[in-house]
Each structure stands twice: as structure tokens, then as C-alpha cells.
């Protein structure tokens, strides 16, 4: 299932079908509503009356379910030298997934099986080879320069060199970067905490995933591993 709507059409359909005024983050950064007067709103109300397309209605309502696992993606990449925003929202309930893809000129609504969600999201983010540098893990305070950076099992000099190497890598130029947030079944008290990842596509190198916690971890990933990590974060088997 796939629908391609203008931002105005999407905003109207979203509000009509879900009774929620604003689209979800990060689509609210691009979708615009029109004034409720004049010919355009009248056209929208006529063409997209409630439940005109039951499949589209079901897709919209799935995105608002309190038991839905939600993945949000916001970032930027360079396409033909020009920066391009990446704004994605995905919701999963059982084996059903819906992906909302926002572009300046259109919002695409797609449905897919939950097992294919990771690959679908990576395809929208854009393909990239795995980075060529081995994975790194260092204390956040050492990398950011806010502590002595001592790590158990490492000498002070070794920890300092590792933190400096990590810092140099993070300062390297990038062609794309973005932020992923995954909230698993928020109405379930047994769900894991919300999870976050940053992807970095370094110029003349490749893609890495960055985990920020007490320790920073930078791991090279290709498309398949990126998709697999998204699926693990969302607890989709």
C-alpha cells in the first residue's frame, strides 16, 4: 500500500482521520496546514472526506495507537551537492508497519510487513558502505574533554590516545548524519527505555552508528547491519 500526498493533503487527512491537529514528529517540521477558508480546503474536504479510503484511514490510525512501537528519523544528506532533509516516522503494531516519509513537495504513506521495516527505513535514509575504521569505545567525559578519561584496563596514556582518536574521527567531515529514536510499545510497563542512535556518513569513508552513554561507541555498519540494528532496537523479531 502506498499513497503520495501533498503536505496540505497529508495535514488534512491526518487531522480528519486521527482527530489530532498536528502530524507527528518529525513530520511536523515540514507538513503545513492551509487556512480553513477558500477553494483549497473545500477541495480537500470533498476529496478526502473521512474514511474515503479505508486502507489509508487504517494506516493513519495505526500511527496514533498507544501500543504502537514508534521509530522517528531526522537527518540530512547531500544529494547532487545540495543538502536534503530526511524526515521519517514509522509505527509498528504486531506484524503491521506504516512509514511516513516527508519531502518538501510530498508526504508518502506506505504500509509494509514489520519484518521489512528496517530495510525500508535504511532505503529511505540512503545507502552507504560500512566505515573502514574499526569500532571505537571510549568514556564520554574523556572524548568531550570533561574528565580524566581513565578507563579500567587501560593506562592513562592509552586512554588519552584512544579518546583523542575518537575525537578526531567525530570532527571529520560528513556527507550525511541523523538521529534515530525508538520507543517500544509505550503503554507496556515492561518495555525497554527509549533508545537513541546517531548515524554518521563520513566523507571518503563510510557509515557508522554512534551510541552516546557514559561510554561513546562508534561502530561501522553497512546497510544490512544498520537495518538489523533498527530491528533489534524496535524488538521486532
Model region roles, listed by residue range:
Residues 1-237:
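Short, surface-exposed polybasic-aromatic patches that bind anionic ligands, especially phosphate groups
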Amino acid at each position: 500500500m502506498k499513497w503520495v500526498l501533498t503536505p496540505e493533503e497529508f495535514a488534512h487527512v491526518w487531522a480528519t482521520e486521527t482527530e489530532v491537529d498536528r502530524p507527528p514528529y518529525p513530520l511536523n517540521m515540514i507538513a503545513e496546514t492551509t487556512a480553513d477558508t477558500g477553494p483549497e480546503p473545500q477541495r480537500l474536504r470533498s476529496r478526502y472526506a473521512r474514511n474515503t479510503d479505508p486502507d489509508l484511514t487504517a494506516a493513519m490510525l495505526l500511527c496514533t495507537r498507544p501500543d504502537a512501537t514508534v521509530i522517528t528519523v531526522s537527518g540530512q544528506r547531500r544529494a547532487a551537492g545540495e543538502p536534503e532533509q530526511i524526515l521519517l516516522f514509522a509505527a509498528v503494531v504486531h506484524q503491521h508497519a506504516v512509514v511516513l516519509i516527508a519531502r518538501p513537495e510530498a508526504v508518502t504513506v506506505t504500509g509494509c510487513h514489520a519484518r521489512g521495516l528496517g530495510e525500508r527505513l535504511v532505503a529511505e535514509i540512503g545507502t552507504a558502505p560500512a566505515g573502514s575504521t574499526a569500532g571505537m569505545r571510549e568514556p564520554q567525559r574523556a572524548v568531550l574533554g570533561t574528565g580524566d578519561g581513565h578507563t579500567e584496563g587501560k593506562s592513562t596514556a592509552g586512554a588519552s590516545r584512544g579518546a583523542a582518536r575518537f575525537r578526531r574521527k567525530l570532527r571529520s567531515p560528513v556527507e550525511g548524519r541523523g538521529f534515530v529514536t525508538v520507543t517500544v510499545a509505550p503503554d507496556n510497563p515492561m518495555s525497554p527505555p527509549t533508545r537513541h542512535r546517531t548515524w554518521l556518513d563520513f566523507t571518503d569513508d563510510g557509515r557508522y552508528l554512534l551510541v552516546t552513554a557514559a561510554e561513546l561507541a562508534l561502530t561501522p555498519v553497512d546497510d544490512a547491519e544498520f537495518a538489523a540494528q533498527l530491528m533489534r532496537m524496535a524488538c521486532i523479531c
